[in-house]
Curated annotation (Swiss-Prot):
Protein's UniProt name: Ribonuclease PH
Chain's gene name: rph
GO biological process assignments: rRNA catabolic process; rRNA processing; tRNA processing
HAMAP family (alphabetical): RNase_PH
Enzyme superclass (EC): transferase
Cystine pairings recorded for this chain: none
Amino acid sequence: MRPSGRTPEQPRDVRITRNYTRHAEGSVLVEFGDTKVICTASVENKVPPFLRGEGKGWITAEYGMLPRSTGSRMGREAARGKQGGRTVEIQRLIGRSLRAAVDLEALGEHTITIDCDVIQADGGTRTAAITGGCVALVDALNHLVKEKRLKKSPLKQMVAAVSVGVYRGTPVADLDYPEDSEAETDMNVIMTDQGGFIEIQGTAEGAPFEQAELDAMLALARKAIDQLFELQKEALSA
């Protein structure tokens, strides 16, 4: 039995609220159960130095957690003057994942930065950030079209992500913190709405996992992510 009472294949309740903040071209509050992340998409009329003159755009991401988003207060990384390795890893993952959603040549020389700020953490913050960040990105792209800075949206496909793992010997979908902290295997799966995999990150915390467990986890991920695509679609049509 999972601590939350959910069945192995049952994800947490997910809510996606668009236009959550006033100033950004795209903004979303995404909630995976008790995990809550604000994702904003900001457009700039410039590209990184390595892309200047190439006629291509860029999608990048930044990630952070509020000091009291967890059970005990964490010091701000800005106060320490250095980002931690986990933060750098996660924001690179978010950026890689969301670049797969967009035709960067069709984006032109624009940079879109997805800022993901965790206001409450209960496991799965990076997968929530990718799922909500994609919706914020779509709104930012549509803003560029509305402002006639692009003729049409360069969106190629939607992207969503979920965590899966093996908890007390059973493959489960969308781990919350109590499960994540005890899981024998923890995996993050990022997919497109066309059925392709963007990234699979999996680690055995105890005993190695078997092929059958891997197959079961990927099947759970695909099913849960299909539900996320429906929720993204509903949010964008609202």
